């Protein structure tokens, strides 16, 4: 029904509940993306360390 919680009103506007729900979903998505980015950064850091170690071994073998 028009004006019910979560329903789109006849004029096309949304109610406060819908806006709040959208904001919470957006926040969840941003937090999830931040966690993924941090995990990727940590993985990259480990890969760089591994690469540095391999380069050191190569340097030692070629001396």
Swiss-Prot record:
It comes from the Eukaryota. GO terms for molecular function: ATPase inhibitor activity. The keyword Coiled coil applies. It is found in: Mitochondrion. Residues 1-23 are annotated as: Disordered. One of its GO terms (cellular component) is mitochondrion. Keywords: Coiled coil, Mitochondrion. Gene3D superfamilies: Single helix bin. Residues 18-62 form a coiled coil. Its main location: mitochondrion. This protein forms a one-to-one complex with ATPase to inhibit the enzyme activity completely. Belongs to the ATPase inhibitor family. This is ATPase inhibitor, mitochondrial.
């Amino acid at each position: 029904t028009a004006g019910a919680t979560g329903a789109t009103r006849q004029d096309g506007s949304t109610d406060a509940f819908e806006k709040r729900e959208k904001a919470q979903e957006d926040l969840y998505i941003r937090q999830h993306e931040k966690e993924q980015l941090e995990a990727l950064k940590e993985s990259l850091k480990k890969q760089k360390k591994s690469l540095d170690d391999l380069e050191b071994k190569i340097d030692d073998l070629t001396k």
